[in-house]
C-alpha cells in the first residue's frame, strides 16, 4: 500500500506587540512548520524616544531625570552610568560615603530587577503563585527608595555628578538591615517552591541552550553570559565604585539553558544581600542624617578644622571618606575627549560612549543597552524549538523594551 506524502506550508504568525508575554511592545514574526519554529524576526522600535539625541542637547545634570526611562525596572543603573561616565571624563573622585550609598542603591535595584524578572517568567511557564510573592518584596525595596529619594519605581533622580543628591535619612540603614534579614529566608522560600519543582524543571531544562563560544561571539553579558560558563562580572573586572571593599562571589553556571539562567539570577540576589549587609556595616560616617550637624561644621572653620572634624566623625586620621565641599567643577563645560564607561546592571553590561568637544553638552552620547545585545541571539536559539517554548525562551533573556528601543 502506497503512503501519501504530506507536506505542510510554512505558517507566519505574529507574537505581539501587545501580547502580555512580550514584556513590552515587542513584536516577533515567527515562521512555523507545524509546531516547530523555523525562523523568528524580532521587530523593535515601538518605544523609541530618541534618548541619545536628548542627551546631546542636555548637560550631564539636566539629563539625569530622563535616564530612568531607558530601563524603567532598573533606573538606578541608568543614573549610575550617566554620572560615572561624566565623572570619568572630568577625572573627578567622589566621596567614599557617596560611593557606598550608590552601591546600596544599585544592589537594591539589582534585587528588584531580578524579582520583576522572576515573577513574569514563572507566569509565562504556568506558575502563577510566585508572581504575587515577588511584589511583596519589591514593595519593601520601593519603601526604602521612597524614604531616600521621594520616588518609588522610576524618576528617583538621586545620583549626581560628584556624589548623590542627599544623605541617607535617620534610621534608613536600620530599615535596610531589617529588609536584608527578612529577604534572605524569602529566597530560600522561592527555591523550595521553584528550583526542584519537577514540573518547572521539565518545562525549561534544555531550552534555549547557548554555548560558551556562542555567548562570547554574540556579545552577551550579565546572567545570559554567566549562565553559559563565563564568570564575567564588571563589578570584579572594572573595580568601579567601592565593590573591591566587599567579599562576594560571581554567580555563574555551565549549562547555558533557561534553567541555568534562572539559577544564576537567584544566586545573584543572594550575593547582592551579602554586599548590602557588608556595606551597611562599613559605610563611612555611620547612620547619620546630617553630616554637617553631626560634626559641628561651621562656615568659619579653617581647612585644618574641617579635616579634624571629619577625622573625628569617621574615626580616620585622613582620607577622602566624605567631603562636604567637593572639588569645584564647571558643569557648563565638559572636558574635551572621548571615553567608554560601563557598569554591571541587572541585565548585563550597560555602557555609554561619550564624545565631548569641550562644550556643555556632549557631541555624541551612545548607549550600549545590555538587553538590546542579548535580544539579538533570540532568533538563533528559537530555531528548532516548539511554538509553546517561545515565551519561556524569551522570558529567560529578560528584556525591557524601553531599554532596547531607547
Curated annotation (Swiss-Prot):
Asked if Transport is a keyword of the record, the answer is: yes
Q: How is the protein disposed in the membrane?
A: Peripheral membrane protein
What highest taxon heads this organism's lineage? Eukaryota
Record field: catalytic activity: a quinone + NADH + H(+) = a quinol + NAD(+)
Which InterPro entries does this UniProt record tie to the protein? Answer: NADH_Q_OxRdtase_suD, NADH_UbQ_OxRdtase_49kDa_CS, NDH1_su_D/H, NiFe-Hase_large
Its annotated compartments are: Plastid, Organellar chromatophore thylakoid membrane
Q: What is its EC number?
A: 7.1.1.-
Q: Identify the PROSITE patterns for this entry.
A: COMPLEX1_49K
Q: What class of enzyme is it?
A: translocase
Tell me a Gene Ontology molecular-function term this record carries: quinone binding
Record's GO cellular component terms: organellar chromatophore thylakoid membrane; plasma membrane; plastid
Provide an example Pfam family for this protein.
Answer: Complex1_49kDa
| PANTHER family in UniProt | NADH DEHYDROGENASE [UBIQUINONE] IRON-SULFUR PROTEIN 2, MITOCHONDRIAL, NADH-UBIQUINONE OXIDOREDUCTASE 49 KDA SUBUNIT
Describe its function: NDH shuttles electrons from NAD(P)H:plastoquinone, via FMN and iron-sulfur (Fe-S) centers, to quinones in the photosynthetic chain and possibly in a chloroplast respiratory chain. The immediate electron acceptor for the enzyme in this species is believed to be plastoquinone. Couples the redox reaction to proton translocation, and thus conserves the redox energy in a proton gradient.
Protein family? Belongs to the complex I 49 kDa subunit family.
| Name recorded for this polypeptide | NAD(P)H-quinone oxidoreductase subunit H, organellar chromatophore
> What is the native source organism of this protein?
Paulinella chromatophora
Amino acid at each position: 500500500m502506497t503512503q501519501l506524502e504530506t507536506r505542510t506550508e510554512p505558517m507566519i504568525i505574529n507574537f505581539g506587540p501587545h501580547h502580555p508575554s512580550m514584556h513590552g511592545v515587542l513584536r516577533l514574526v515567527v515562521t512555523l512548520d507545524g509546531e516547530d519554529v523555523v525562523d523568528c524576526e524580532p521587530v523593535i522600535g515601538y518605544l523609541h524616544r530618541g534618548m541619545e539625541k536628548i542627551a546631546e542637547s542636555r548637560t550631564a545634570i539636566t539629563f539625569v531625570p530622563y535616564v530612568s526611562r531607558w530601563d524603567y525596572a532598573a533606573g538606578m543603573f541608568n543614573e549610575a552610568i550617566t554620572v560615572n561616565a561624566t565623572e570619568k571624563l572630568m577625572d573627578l573622585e567622589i566621596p567614599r560615603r557617596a560611593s557606598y550609598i550608590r552601591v546600596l542603591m544599585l544592589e537594591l535595584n539589582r534585587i528588584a530587577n531580578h524579582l520583576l524578572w522572576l515573577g513574569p517568567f514563572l507566569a509565562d511557564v504556568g506558575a502563577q503563585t510566585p508572581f504575587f510573592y515577588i511584589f511583596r518584596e519589591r514593595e519593601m525595596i520601593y519603601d526604602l527608595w521612597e524614604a531616600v529619594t521621594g520616588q518609588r519605581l522610576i524618576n528617583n533622580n538621586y545620583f549626581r555628578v560628584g556624589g548623590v543628591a542627599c544623605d541617607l535619612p535617620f534610621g534608613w540603614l536600620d530599615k535596610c538591615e531589617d529588609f536584608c534579614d527578612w529577604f534572605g529566608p524569602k529566597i530560600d522560600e522561592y527555591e523550595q517552591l521553584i528550583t526542584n519543582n519537577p514540573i518547572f524543571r521539565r518545562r525549561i531544562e534544555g531550552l534555549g541552550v547557548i554555548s560558551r563560544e556562542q555567548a562570547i561571539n554574540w556579545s552577551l553579558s550579565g546572567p545570559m553570559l554567566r549562565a553559559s560558563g563565563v564568570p564575567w562580572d564588571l563589578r570584579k573586572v572594572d573595580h568601579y565604585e567601592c565593590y573591591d571593599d566587599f567579599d562576594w562571589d560571581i554567580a555563574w553556571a555551565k549549562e547555558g539553558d533557561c534553567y541555568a539562567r534562572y539559577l544564576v539570577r537567584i544566586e545573584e540576589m543572594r550575593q547582592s544581600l551579602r554586599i548590602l549587609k557588608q556595606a551597611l556595616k562599613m559605610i563611612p560616617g555611620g547612620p547619620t542624617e546630617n553630616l554637617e550637624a553631626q560634626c559641628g561644621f561651621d562656615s568659619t572653620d579653617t581647612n585644618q578644622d574641617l579635616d579634624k572634624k571629619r577625622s573625628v566623625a569617621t574615626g580616620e586620621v585622613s582620607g577622602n571618606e566624605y567631603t562636604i565641599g567637593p572639588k569645584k567643577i564647571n558643569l557648563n563645560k565638559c572636558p574635551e575627549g572621548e571615553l567608554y564607561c560601563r557598569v554591571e546592571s541587572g541585565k548585563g553590561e550597560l555602557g555609554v560612549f561619550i564624545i565631548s568637544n569641550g562644550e556643555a553638552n556632549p557631541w555624541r552620547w551612545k548607549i550600549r543597552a545590555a538587553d538590546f545585545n542579548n535580544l539579538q541571539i533570540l532568533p538563533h536559539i528559537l530555531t528548532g524549538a516548539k511554538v509553546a517554548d517561545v515565551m519561556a525562551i524569551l522570558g529567560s533573556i529578560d528584556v525591557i523594551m524601553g531599554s532596547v528601543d531607547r
